[in-house]
Amino acid sequence: MSELKEVVVVSGVRLPVGSYGGSLKNTPAIDMGAMVVKEAVKRAGIEPSVVDEVIIGQVGEVAENGFVARAISLKAGMPKETTAYSVNRQCGSGLQSIVEAVMEIQTGQADVVVAGGAENISQLPYYVKDARWG
C-alpha cells in the first residue's frame, strides 16, 4: 500500500450562529455558504481555479437548493469545472465533509478541497403530518 499524503488546513472561516427565526432567517444557506467559501479561499491565498472539489454538509435540504454544494461553489466564484457534492450525515454533516476532503487528499484524488457545512434551519420546510388528507 502506498503512503498517504499529508493534509494541512490552510484556512478556516465561519459565520456567527444565529437564532431560530432571527436576523438571518431570510438569508439562504447558499448565500451564507458562498460568502464563507469565498473568504476561506481568499485567506488561503489561492485562486479559485486551483480548488479541485467543494464538499458541503447540510442536514436539511430545501427543494430550491437541491444541490447546495454546487450552488455554493459557483456562487463563491469557483470555475464550472470544479466538482462539488453535498453530504448529509445529520448533525455531523459539516464534519463528514471535512473527513471526506482529508481522504481525497490523502489518497491523491485531489490536492485542494474546500469543505464545511451550510445550513439555515429557519428556512427548512414546516412539516405537518397528515395535513394533506385532513
Task: Name each model feature, range by range.
Residues 13-17:
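Short polar catalytic/cofactor-binding loops
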Residues 10:
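Ligand-binding pocket segment of bilobal, Venus flytrap-like solute-binding proteins
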Residues 50-57, 114:
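Short glycine-rich phosphate-binding loop at a beta-alpha junction
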Residues 1-7, 19-48, 62-134:
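Acyl-thioester C-C bond-transforming condensing/cleaving domain
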